[in-house]
Amino acid sequence: MNLEKFIKDVKDFPKQGINFKDISPLLANGQALNYTIKKMAELAKDADIIVGPDARGFLFGTPTAAFLSKPFIMVRKKGKLPGEVIKHEYDLEYGKDILEIQKGVIKPGDKAIIIDDVLATGGTTKAIIDLLESQGAKVIKIILLLELTNLNGRSKFGSLQVESLVKVSV
């Protein structure tokens, strides 16, 4: 199935000069969504845990984890998770941000696969890798619906395997 036909270009969103890749048509098509989850599950079968960032990583990571009967670990921005959390501060283009996971959800040695919707510059994904590794997990792969290849985000991950179902240049 050609998933690219379910990703719509929206010019000048969210601001002038940006060509936004809208995945809503894919989510609104049951066959395309089912195909996407099955493809991601094939790629993620070696994981002990599936990890996804808020919010759109949840859209693909949770059903993939459920399909494989694997745990799904949420990575959220500061202050969005209850209980004790592990924090990781990382640099943005114009400042800093903080990602969190709940304490105790990662076991040392867990083989983790990160699933997300889009890879652009790779900054957030790199921060997730650092957070997981700080808890003893081994990130073995990154799986994405869409990779914006000209932004070269995968260069931040060294030799780590990156699987993208759709690759485009913006």
UniProtKB/Swiss-Prot annotation:
Cellular component terms (Gene Ontology): cytoplasm
UniProt key word Magnesium: no
Places the protein is found: Cytoplasm
Annotated GO biological process: adenine salvage; AMP salvage; purine ribonucleoside salvage
Pathway noted in the entry: Purine metabolism; AMP biosynthesis via salvage pathway; AMP from adenine: step 1/1
One Pfam short name: Pribosyltran
Entry keyword set: Cytoplasm, Glycosyltransferase, Purine salvage, Transferase
E.C. code: 2.4.2.7
Enzyme kind, highest EC tier: transferase
One annotated GO molecular function: AMP binding
InterPro entries documented for this protein: Ade_phspho_trans (IPR005764), PRibTrfase_dom (IPR000836), PRTase-like (IPR029057), UPRTase/APRTase (IPR050054)
Catalytic activity: AMP + diphosphate = 5-phospho-alpha-D-ribose 1-diphosphate + adenine
The keyword Membrane is annotated on this UniProt entry: no
Coiled coil: none
Record's subunit section: Homodimer.
The protein's role, per its UniProt record: Catalyzes a salvage reaction resulting in the formation of AMP, that is energically less costly than de novo synthesis.
Family statement drawn from the similarity comment of this UniProt entry: Belongs to the purine/pyrimidine phosphoribosyltransferase family.
Protein name: Adenine phosphoribosyltransferase
Species whose genome carries this gene: Mycoplasmopsis pulmonis (strain UAB CTIP) (Mycoplasma pulmonis)
Organism lineage string: Bacteria, Bacillati, Mycoplasmatota, Mycoplasmoidales, Metamycoplasmataceae
Gene: apt
